[in-house]
Regions:
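Active-site-adjacent structural segments surrounding the nucleophilic cysteine of cysteine proteases
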Residues: 4-186
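Conserved active-site-adjacent core of cysteine acyl-enzyme catalytic domains
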Residues: 12-14, 75, 164, 168-287
Length: 287
Protein backbone atom coordinates (compact mmCIF):
# COMPACT_ATOMS: atom_id res chain seq x y z
CA UNK A 1 0.00 0.00 0.00
CA UNK A 2 2.83 2.31 0.83
CA UNK A 3 4.45 1.61 -2.51
CA UNK A 4 1.20 2.17 -4.30
CA UNK A 5 0.66 5.30 -2.24
CA UNK A 6 4.13 6.58 -3.12
CA UNK A 7 3.59 5.77 -6.78
CA UNK A 8 0.22 7.52 -6.73
CA UNK A 9 1.74 10.58 -5.04
CA UNK A 10 4.62 10.56 -7.48
CA UNK A 11 2.20 10.40 -10.40
CA UNK A 12 0.19 13.27 -8.97
CA UNK A 13 3.40 15.19 -8.37
CA UNK A 14 4.52 14.50 -11.91
CA UNK A 15 1.17 15.64 -13.30
CA UNK A 16 1.33 18.79 -11.22
CA UNK A 17 4.83 19.51 -12.54
CA UNK A 18 3.70 19.03 -16.13
CA UNK A 19 0.70 21.28 -15.56
CA UNK A 20 2.93 23.97 -14.10
CA UNK A 21 5.30 23.64 -17.06
CA UNK A 22 2.42 23.93 -19.52
CA UNK A 23 1.09 26.96 -17.70
CA UNK A 24 4.53 28.56 -17.76
CA UNK A 25 4.92 27.91 -21.48
CA UNK A 26 1.40 29.15 -22.13
CA UNK A 27 2.13 32.30 -20.15
CA UNK A 28 5.38 32.80 -22.03
CA UNK A 29 3.64 32.29 -25.37
CA UNK A 30 0.96 34.74 -24.33
CA UNK A 31 3.56 37.32 -23.41
CA UNK A 32 5.26 36.88 -26.79
CA UNK A 33 1.92 37.19 -28.57
CA UNK A 34 1.11 40.30 -26.58
CA UNK A 35 4.53 41.73 -27.39
CA UNK A 36 4.10 40.92 -31.08
CA UNK A 37 0.63 42.46 -31.06
CA UNK A 38 1.98 45.56 -29.37
CA UNK A 39 4.80 45.76 -31.91
CA UNK A 40 2.36 45.46 -34.81
CA UNK A 41 0.06 48.03 -33.28
CA UNK A 42 3.00 50.38 -32.72
CA UNK A 43 4.12 49.82 -36.30
CA UNK A 44 0.65 50.52 -37.66
CA UNK A 45 0.42 53.62 -35.51
CA UNK A 46 3.86 54.82 -36.63
CA UNK A 47 2.98 54.18 -40.26
CA UNK A 48 -0.33 55.98 -39.84
CA UNK A 49 1.45 58.92 -38.26
CA UNK A 50 3.99 58.98 -41.10
CA UNK A 51 1.22 58.90 -43.71
CA UNK A 52 -0.64 61.61 -41.82
CA UNK A 53 2.54 63.68 -41.66
CA UNK A 54 3.04 63.35 -45.42
CA UNK A 55 -0.61 64.18 -46.00
CA UNK A 56 -0.33 67.17 -43.70
CA UNK A 57 2.79 68.29 -45.58
CA UNK A 58 0.97 67.93 -48.90
CA UNK A 59 -2.07 69.75 -47.56
CA UNK A 60 0.17 72.54 -46.30
CA UNK A 61 1.93 72.71 -49.68
CA UNK A 62 -1.40 72.74 -51.54
CA UNK A 63 -2.72 75.44 -49.22
CA UNK A 64 0.41 77.51 -49.78
CA UNK A 65 0.01 77.21 -53.54
CA UNK A 66 -3.64 78.22 -53.33
CA UNK A 67 -2.95 81.30 -51.23
CA UNK A 68 0.24 82.58 -52.89
CA UNK A 69 0.13 85.67 -55.10
CA UNK A 70 1.18 85.59 -58.76
CA UNK A 71 4.53 87.13 -57.82
CA UNK A 72 5.06 84.62 -55.02
CA UNK A 73 4.26 81.74 -57.34
CA UNK A 74 6.77 82.93 -59.92
CA UNK A 75 9.43 83.28 -57.20
CA UNK A 76 8.66 79.78 -55.90
CA UNK A 77 8.70 78.21 -59.37
CA UNK A 78 11.96 80.00 -60.19
CA UNK A 79 13.63 78.69 -57.03
CA UNK A 80 12.35 75.16 -57.63
CA UNK A 81 13.57 75.32 -61.23
CA UNK A 82 17.03 76.52 -60.19
CA UNK A 83 17.27 73.83 -57.51
CA UNK A 84 16.20 71.15 -59.99
CA UNK A 85 18.79 72.34 -62.52
CA UNK A 86 16.40 73.32 -65.31
CA UNK A 87 18.02 74.90 -68.40
CA UNK A 88 18.72 78.60 -67.98
CA UNK A 89 16.71 79.49 -71.09
CA UNK A 90 13.66 77.72 -69.66
CA UNK A 91 13.92 79.63 -66.38
CA UNK A 92 14.32 82.91 -68.31
CA UNK A 93 10.84 82.42 -69.75
CA UNK A 94 9.51 83.62 -66.38
CA UNK A 95 11.24 86.98 -66.88
CA UNK A 96 10.05 87.37 -70.45
CA UNK A 97 6.42 86.42 -69.87
CA UNK A 98 4.72 85.51 -66.55
CA UNK A 99 2.14 83.56 -68.57
CA UNK A 100 4.74 80.79 -68.92
CA UNK A 101 4.80 79.96 -65.18
CA UNK A 102 2.81 76.72 -65.52
CA UNK A 103 5.01 75.58 -68.40
CA UNK A 104 8.17 76.16 -66.35
CA UNK A 105 6.67 74.55 -63.25
CA UNK A 106 5.78 71.39 -65.22
CA UNK A 107 9.10 71.17 -67.10
CA UNK A 108 10.57 68.40 -64.96
CA UNK A 109 7.66 65.99 -65.33
CA UNK A 110 6.61 66.81 -68.90
CA UNK A 111 9.81 67.60 -70.79
CA UNK A 112 10.01 64.11 -72.30
CA UNK A 113 6.35 63.71 -73.22
CA UNK A 114 5.32 63.16 -76.83
CA UNK A 115 3.82 66.23 -78.52
CA UNK A 116 0.15 66.44 -79.42
CA UNK A 117 -0.73 65.13 -82.87
CA UNK A 118 -3.19 67.87 -83.81
CA UNK A 119 -4.23 71.43 -83.18
CA UNK A 120 -7.61 71.02 -81.49
CA UNK A 121 -10.84 72.83 -82.36
CA UNK A 122 -11.04 74.41 -78.90
CA UNK A 123 -7.97 76.54 -79.59
CA UNK A 124 -8.92 80.20 -79.89
CA UNK A 125 -9.02 81.73 -83.35
CA UNK A 126 -8.16 85.13 -84.76
CA UNK A 127 -10.45 85.07 -87.76
CA UNK A 128 -9.55 81.86 -89.58
CA UNK A 129 -6.22 81.41 -87.79
CA UNK A 130 -5.75 79.47 -84.54
CA UNK A 131 -4.04 81.39 -81.75
CA UNK A 132 -1.26 78.93 -81.00
CA UNK A 133 1.39 79.48 -78.35
CA UNK A 134 4.94 78.21 -78.63
CA UNK A 135 5.02 77.44 -74.88
CA UNK A 136 1.81 75.42 -74.98
CA UNK A 137 2.58 72.23 -73.02
CA UNK A 138 1.25 70.13 -75.91
CA UNK A 139 4.38 70.86 -77.96
CA UNK A 140 6.46 73.50 -76.16
CA UNK A 141 8.86 70.91 -74.68
CA UNK A 142 9.63 69.46 -78.13
CA UNK A 143 13.08 70.10 -79.63
CA UNK A 144 13.88 72.84 -82.10
CA UNK A 145 17.48 72.90 -83.27
CA UNK A 146 19.36 72.38 -80.01
CA UNK A 147 16.72 74.30 -78.07
CA UNK A 148 12.98 73.72 -77.54
CA UNK A 149 9.92 75.26 -79.18
CA UNK A 150 8.89 77.21 -76.08
CA UNK A 151 12.22 79.05 -76.06
CA UNK A 152 13.09 79.42 -79.75
CA UNK A 153 10.11 78.27 -81.81
CA UNK A 154 8.21 81.46 -82.67
CA UNK A 155 8.92 80.89 -86.38
CA UNK A 156 7.60 77.32 -86.59
CA UNK A 157 4.61 78.29 -84.44
CA UNK A 158 3.69 81.13 -86.80
CA UNK A 159 3.96 78.81 -89.80
CA UNK A 160 1.80 76.24 -88.03
CA UNK A 161 -0.91 78.88 -87.53
CA UNK A 162 -0.70 79.83 -91.22
CA UNK A 163 -0.93 76.27 -92.51
CA UNK A 164 -3.82 75.30 -90.24
CA UNK A 165 -5.70 78.49 -91.12
CA UNK A 166 -5.12 78.42 -94.88
CA UNK A 167 -5.33 74.66 -95.51
CA UNK A 168 -7.41 73.34 -92.61
CA UNK A 169 -4.81 70.64 -91.91
CA UNK A 170 -4.74 70.46 -88.10
CA UNK A 171 -1.94 67.88 -88.05
CA UNK A 172 0.61 70.58 -88.91
CA UNK A 173 1.44 71.39 -85.30
CA UNK A 174 4.39 73.52 -84.17
CA UNK A 175 6.36 70.33 -83.43
CA UNK A 176 5.77 69.03 -86.98
CA UNK A 177 6.92 72.35 -88.44
CA UNK A 178 9.91 72.51 -86.07
CA UNK A 179 11.01 69.00 -87.08
CA UNK A 180 10.84 69.91 -90.77
CA UNK A 181 12.72 73.17 -90.26
CA UNK A 182 15.45 71.46 -88.23
CA UNK A 183 15.90 68.58 -90.66
CA UNK A 184 16.09 70.93 -93.64
CA UNK A 185 18.52 73.40 -92.05
CA UNK A 186 16.14 76.33 -91.65
CA UNK A 187 17.36 76.91 -88.08
CA UNK A 188 20.82 78.36 -87.46
CA UNK A 189 23.46 77.68 -84.81
CA UNK A 190 21.75 80.12 -82.43
CA UNK A 191 18.43 78.30 -82.86
CA UNK A 192 16.99 81.23 -84.81
CA UNK A 193 14.67 80.54 -87.74
CA UNK A 194 16.13 81.69 -91.06
CA UNK A 195 14.15 84.02 -93.29
CA UNK A 196 14.44 81.44 -96.08
CA UNK A 197 12.04 79.25 -94.13
CA UNK A 198 9.39 81.96 -94.39
CA UNK A 199 9.70 81.97 -98.19
CA UNK A 200 10.83 78.64 -99.63
CA UNK A 201 10.22 76.55 -96.51
CA UNK A 202 6.45 77.08 -96.48
CA UNK A 203 6.17 75.68 -100.01
CA UNK A 204 6.36 72.24 -98.38
CA UNK A 205 2.74 72.77 -97.24
CA UNK A 206 1.55 74.26 -100.52
CA UNK A 207 1.64 77.91 -99.49
CA UNK A 208 2.62 80.78 -101.75
CA UNK A 209 4.72 83.59 -100.29
CA UNK A 210 5.80 86.98 -101.54
CA UNK A 211 7.82 89.64 -99.81
CA UNK A 212 6.33 93.05 -99.08
CA UNK A 213 7.81 96.45 -98.25
CA UNK A 214 5.35 96.81 -95.36
CA UNK A 215 3.53 99.83 -96.77
CA UNK A 216 0.37 100.29 -94.70
CA UNK A 217 -2.02 100.55 -97.63
CA UNK A 218 -0.60 97.39 -99.15
CA UNK A 219 -0.83 95.53 -95.81
CA UNK A 220 -4.44 96.66 -95.43
CA UNK A 221 -5.29 95.43 -98.93
CA UNK A 222 -3.70 92.02 -98.41
CA UNK A 223 -5.32 91.46 -95.02
CA UNK A 224 -8.73 92.48 -96.36
CA UNK A 225 -8.23 89.87 -99.11
CA UNK A 226 -7.68 87.19 -96.46
CA UNK A 227 -3.93 86.97 -96.95
CA UNK A 228 -2.13 86.72 -93.59
CA UNK A 229 1.17 88.49 -93.04
CA UNK A 230 4.20 87.34 -91.06
CA UNK A 231 6.49 90.06 -89.71
CA UNK A 232 10.03 89.70 -88.41
CA UNK A 233 10.24 92.13 -85.49
CA UNK A 234 13.01 94.26 -84.06
CA UNK A 235 13.33 94.86 -80.30
CA UNK A 236 10.34 96.80 -79.05
CA UNK A 237 6.85 95.90 -77.90
CA UNK A 238 7.20 92.22 -78.77
CA UNK A 239 10.80 91.21 -78.17
CA UNK A 240 14.18 92.12 -76.72
CA UNK A 241 16.11 90.43 -79.53
CA UNK A 242 14.00 89.18 -82.47
CA UNK A 243 10.58 87.64 -83.01
CA UNK A 244 7.97 86.59 -85.55
CA UNK A 245 4.30 87.57 -85.33
CA UNK A 246 1.29 87.24 -87.66
CA UNK A 247 -0.99 90.07 -88.75
CA UNK A 248 -4.48 88.67 -89.33
CA UNK A 249 -6.79 91.64 -89.99
CA UNK A 250 -6.82 95.42 -90.56
CA UNK A 251 -9.46 97.97 -89.57
CA UNK A 252 -9.11 101.76 -89.63
CA UNK A 253 -5.38 101.81 -89.00
CA UNK A 254 -5.41 99.00 -86.44
CA UNK A 255 -4.27 95.42 -86.88
CA UNK A 256 -5.02 92.25 -84.95
CA UNK A 257 -2.13 89.90 -84.45
CA UNK A 258 -1.25 86.40 -83.34
CA UNK A 259 1.82 86.59 -81.12
CA UNK A 260 3.07 83.02 -80.55
CA UNK A 261 4.70 84.06 -77.28
CA UNK A 262 2.01 86.22 -75.66
CA UNK A 263 -1.71 85.78 -75.11
CA UNK A 264 -1.92 89.34 -73.85
CA UNK A 265 -0.45 90.78 -77.05
CA UNK A 266 -2.79 88.67 -79.18
CA UNK A 267 -5.84 90.05 -77.38
CA UNK A 268 -4.93 93.66 -78.16
CA UNK A 269 -5.62 95.75 -81.22
CA UNK A 270 -2.43 97.45 -82.41
CA UNK A 271 -2.09 100.69 -84.32
CA UNK A 272 -0.09 99.79 -87.40
CA UNK A 273 1.86 103.05 -87.36
CA UNK A 274 2.89 102.24 -83.78
CA UNK A 275 4.51 98.93 -84.70
CA UNK A 276 5.63 99.54 -88.30
CA UNK A 277 8.99 100.97 -87.22
CA UNK A 278 9.67 97.70 -85.36
CA UNK A 279 9.19 95.57 -88.49
CA UNK A 280 12.32 94.25 -90.22
CA UNK A 281 10.74 92.09 -92.92
CA UNK A 282 7.24 91.27 -94.18
CA UNK A 283 5.88 88.22 -96.02
CA UNK A 284 2.37 87.81 -97.43
CA UNK A 285 0.80 84.35 -97.80
CA UNK A 286 -1.93 82.64 -99.76
CA UNK A 287 -2.94 79.10 -100.63
Amino acid sequence: VVIIGCATWALKSDNMARKADIQAKTSQTGRKADAAKTSVENGVQANSEAVKEKTDDKDTSDTTKKTETAEERIARVRQEAVTAGYPEKVIELLDKNPETVQFVEDYGKKKDQAPAATVEAEDGYSGMFPEILQWDERWGYSPYGTSIIAVSGCGPTCVSMLVVGLTGDKTVTPSVVADYATQNHYVDENNDTTWAFMTSGVEHWGLTCRESNGNESEIAKELEAGHPVICSMRPGDFTDIGHFIILTSYNNGNVTICDPFSLENSKKSWNYSQISSQIKAVWVYSK
